[in-house]
Regions:
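Short beta-rich binding modules
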Residues: 1-91
């Protein structure tokens, strides 16, 4: 699935990742936690980022996070227009 990955101190990067729990955990380097960014966009981050003092990132999140969408109870990839929206708004 196509996601935007945000690492502390680096610009957002468009990546293709597998839509599996293991792949999501690998990106955030730990257990995942989700939050709504907008009605359709989800932030997926490390649920223990603050506990482990991971570097502070955008939006007050600690550690690497990515943005995707939801398809029911599953994650889904971003559309081209969603990628453009994120490139303009999440810096």
């Amino acid at each position: 699935m196509k996601v935007m990955v945000y690492e502390p101190g680096h610009p957002g990067e468009l990546r293709e990742i597998d839509n599996t729990l293991a792949a999501c955990q690998e990106v955030v380097d730990g257990y995942i936690e989700t939050m709504h960014l907008t009605g359709e966009l989800l932030i997926v981050c490390n649920e223990e980022g603050r506990l482990y003092n991971l570097p502070r990132n955008r939006l007050g999140i600690c550690g690497t996070f990515f943005v995707c969408t939801a398809a029911g109870e599953d994650f889904d990839g971003l559309s081209d227009s969603q990628v453009e929206y994120l490139r303009k708004t999440v810096r």
